[in-house]
Amino acid sequence: MPIKAVIFDLDGTITRPYFDFDAIREQMGLPRDSGPVLESMLKMAPAQRRRAERILHHHEREAVERSELNPGARQTLSALRRMGLRIGVLTRNTRANAVAIARKHDLRFDAIVDREDGPVKPDSFGVLHLCRQFGVEPGQTLLVGDYLFDLLCAKAAGAVAVLLSNNDRANEFAAHADFCIENISEILQIVEQSNRGSTV
């Protein structure tokens, strides 16, 4: 089945890894082993959650201001567009921050799904939503990310899971990936090989 769309995680995939989630948990008063921040916040009392949201928003805004693209990101996005593929972003961040990063780095995405649109990764919602918007099947879609939730999300939706190995935990996640890459530009080779001989 030909690849017709590529969905990217944002933080750590399009941009270089920045967030120190242990520091964020500490500021929120959470144990280091408390699990993902967003899920932990849902369990908080209202006043504690509001404080945690302010802390998270501060770190997210700082991440936008200091964001740098991963090597090859802009060139890869441009090449995918020339190949006629649809390009989406699926992030646990906010739409405002995703748009701010796109503007800062002069990037163009066909669609963005953020944490305010529905259930977040690893739920399959975002992938399925983008596939419907693009008019493609999940099996015609790559999901590229640097964390376990990206891969589980892809698998749950029936998309092709691609792990960008850019952190010291990548080996823990590799078993859940269909492809493992070290540079985002390797996506182009995956698309070309997948589409070679495929009928549209």
Predicted segments with their positions:
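Short, basic/glycine-rich phosphate-binding loops at helix/coil junctions
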Residues: 49-60, 107-112
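Small/polar loops that bind or transfer phosphate-bearing groups
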Residues: 16, 89-90, 145, 165
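Residue-level recognition of oxygen-bearing side chains
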Residues: 19-20, 72, 149, 186
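Active-site neighborhood of HAD-like aspartate-dependent phosphohydrolases
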Residues: 1-50
